[in-house]
Amino acid sequence: MPRSLKKGPFIDHHLLKKVEVAAEKNDRRPIKTWSRRSMILPEMVGLTIAVHNGRQHVPVLVSEEMVGHKLGEFAATRTYRGHVADKKAKR
């Protein structure tokens, strides 16, 4: 269920500060964050945010279509290696 409109979007304060500083200085370096739960705001468009997936930080270039989604949606946490083939079927 989506968040109530009267509450507004959730974003961690430390991430919001980093985004404001990067936008003010016109800094292009990636912003490293562990906050997968934060929502993407219009102020983040054009910035690169390195989102932690549990093992490493995945760089995500924020575009206008991403506004309103959460950062964690763009950094996959699981790797799919395919189904294991049956050894008897190969013979």
Curated annotation (Swiss-Prot):
GO cellular component assignments: cytoplasm; small ribosomal subunit
Family, per entry: Belongs to the universal ribosomal protein uS19 family.
Known role: Protein S19 forms a complex with S13 that binds strongly to the 16S ribosomal RNA.
Keywords attached to this entry: Ribonucleoprotein, Ribosomal protein, RNA-binding, rRNA-binding
GO BP terms in the entry: ribosomal small subunit assembly; translation
Pfam families for this protein: Ribosomal_S19
Molecular function as annotated in GO: rRNA binding; structural constituent of ribosome
Originating organism: Teredinibacter turnerae (strain ATCC 39867 / T7901)
Alphabetical list of PROSITE patterns matching this protein: RIBOSOMAL_S19
Name of the molecule in the record: Small ribosomal subunit protein uS19
InterPro entries reported for this sequence: Ribosomal_uS19, Ribosomal_uS19_bac-type, Ribosomal_uS19_CS, Ribosomal_uS19_SF
